[in-house]
């Protein structure tokens, strides 16, 4: 099993006391901002990275654009994945790494080995798997945790989640400090990717999504954020741009400054923030 860094040890310890993800995030935020200012001279440098390792999901939830579109199954090329990680290694990235966009990460059989590669090159990162839990078994959890995962965020999409919870009980019992279970039902919906129309959306005065998380698709494109399902707003590709050049690019930088001030110049942002 990979040796945990100190952040991972603290993360698992706090979760054993059932401290919620939102509280953990609030604890992590100020620390990461100070660290990013020291390392990059930028308080708002991204502290999380999400990599779309495939486009495949086994579910077609009504509130997800996957229910509206027939998406071909594509997998990130190993070369593209390695390039992303190597660029993150070059800037000494030490934040959180996710393995999803609108996909189910556990459908990619390469996931444990991808995480091992990340752990080798980004030893100070926290590896986090966001999943619907449908394919998670004790054996797979063993492999993923051995590879370097310290957190599973399982989202229950069914109205009655008892069946899934019963299925996951042996895994959670074996690794009590590694799981956070959440349900989408009973909460205000966000208009993810523009898939749903509801009378009341969560309204935002400002948006920090593109500031906090850098979203890669399977082709190596850097997208606006996790809501850009249709990939309408790419800001660069690691095939011909460096990570720093993309992040510090004029258009991307100006958009992030505007969003910090509550200015939504793009339609996707106005819809997401409840301004349209």
Language-model region placement:
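Exposed loop/turn and edge beta-strand positions of beta-sandwich/beta-sheet ligand-binding modules
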Residues: 47, 210, 229
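Conserved alpha-helical substructure of the radical SAM core
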Residues: 3-152
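Secreted/processed peptides and extracellular or luminal domains of membrane proteins
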Residues: 63, 67-70, 213, 231-232, ...
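Conserved AdoMet/S-adenosylmethionine-binding subsite of the radical SAM
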Residues: 86, 108-212, 217
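Short cysteine clusters
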Residues: 57, 61-64, 207, 225-226, ...
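Processing junctions and N-termini across compartments
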Residues: 51, 55-58, 201, 263-266
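C-terminal accessory region of radical SAM enzymes
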Residues: 2-9, 170-198, 227-276
């Amino acid at each position: 099993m990979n040796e945990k860094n100190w952040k991972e040890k603290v993360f698992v310890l706090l979760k054993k006391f059932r401290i919620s993800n939102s509280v953990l995030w609030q604890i992590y935020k100020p620390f990461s901002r100070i660290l990013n200012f020291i390392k990059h001279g930028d308080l708002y440098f991204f502290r999380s990275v999400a990599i779309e390792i495939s486009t495949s999901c086994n579910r077609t939830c009504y509130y997800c654009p996957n229910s509206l579109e027939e998406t071909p199954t594509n997998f990130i090329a190993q070369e593209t994945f390695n390039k992303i990680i190597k660029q993150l290694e070059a800037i000494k990235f030490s934040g959180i790494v996710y393995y999803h966009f609108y996909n189910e990460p556990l459908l990619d059989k390469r996931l444990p080995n991808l995480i091992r590669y990340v752990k080798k090159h980004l030893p100070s990162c926290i590896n986090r798997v966001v999943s619907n839990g449908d394919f998670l078994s004790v054996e797979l959890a063993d492999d993923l945790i051995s590879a370097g995962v310290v957190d599973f965020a399982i989202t229950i999409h069914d109205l009655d989640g008892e069946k899934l919870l019963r299925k996951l009980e042996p895994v959670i019992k074996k690794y009590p400090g590694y799981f956070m279970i959440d349900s989408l039902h009973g909460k205000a919906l966000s208009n993810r990717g523009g898939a749903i129309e509801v009378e009341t959306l969560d309204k935002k005065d400002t948006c920090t999504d593109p500031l906090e998380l850098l979203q890669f698709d399977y082709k190596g494109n850097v997208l606006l954020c996790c809501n850009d399902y249709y990939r309408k707003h790419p800001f660069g590709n690691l095939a011909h741009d460096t990570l720093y050049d993309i992040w510090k690019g004029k258009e991307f930088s100006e958009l992030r400054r505007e969003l910090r001030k509550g200015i939504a110049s793009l339609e996707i942002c106005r819809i997401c923030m409840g301004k349209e």
